[in-house]
Curated annotation (Swiss-Prot):
TCTP domain span: 1-172
Subcellular location: Cytoplasm
Keyword hit for Calcium: yes
Molecular functions per Gene Ontology: calcium ion binding
Keyword terms, alphabetized: Calcium, Cytoplasm
Pfam families named among the record's database cross-references: TCTP
The family this protein is said to belong to: Belongs to the TCTP family.
PROSITE patterns linked to this entry: TCTP_1, TCTP_2, TCTP_3
Family annotation (InterPro entries): Mss4-like_sf, Mss4/transl-control_tumour, TCTP, Translation_control_tumour_CS, Translational_control_tumour_p
Principal localisation: cytoplasm
GO cellular component, one term: cytoplasm
Keyword flag Calcium: yes
Organism: Drosophila pseudoobscura pseudoobscura
Record protein name field: Translationally-controlled tumor protein homolog
Length: 172
């Protein structure tokens, strides 16, 4: 199994246990599911409640959300009220990623510069439909993952977007 971590903060962002698609060699799209879980138990949304154990009536801690967000302790970030503030963040973040890339993988710099401009325009065009998540450290200097709900086969599926060059892979 591979864990993908933010190269700036070291936060765990996602693992290769989910369906992943690489877009334009710069953005990983990770397809999540809506889940609810009590304690360590995980239940998928829409499961047949009558086929499950009866509720004892005790107070339990139930958390619901996107599996990738819950499993990797991502935290919703409300720092970007408008496109301009997100664009400023992106420009600053891209400079940091370029510096790391030039140091570790100079052959990827041109790919990153060329394809990232296209990806940024596409993302900014859908800005109002996005949610933003940081890693567990809540450090906005690092990667801010994007979540968008897409209609796939008649279902609303959460798709998380991560910038490939802002991640490092760690084998477990």
């Amino acid at each position: 199994m591979k864990i993908f971590k933010d190269i700036i903060t070291g936060d765990e962002m996602f693992a290769d246990t989910y369906k992943i698609k690489l877009v334009d060699d710069v953005v990983y799209e990770v397809y999540g599911k809506l889940i609810s879980r009590e304690g360590s138990e995980i239940k998928l949304e829409g499961a047949n409640a009558s086929a499950e154990e009866a509720d004892e009536g005790t107070d339990t801690n139930v958390e619901s959300g996107v599996d990738v967000v819950l499993n990797h302790r991502l935290v919703e970030c409300f720092a970007f009220g408008d496109k301009k503030s997100y664009t400023l963040y992106l420009k600053d973040y891209m400079k940091k990623v370029l510096a790391k890339l030039a140091e570790k993988s100079p052959d990827q710099v041109d790919v990153f510069k060329t394809n990232m401009n296209k990806a940024m325009k596409d993302i900014l065009g859908r800005f109002k439909e996005l949610q933003f998540f940081t890693g567990e450290s809540m450090d906005c200097d690092g990667m801010v993952a994007l979540v968008e709900y897409r209609e796939i086969d008649g279902q609303s599926i959460p798709v998380l977007m991560f910038f490939k060059h802002g991640l490092e892979e760690e084998k477990c």
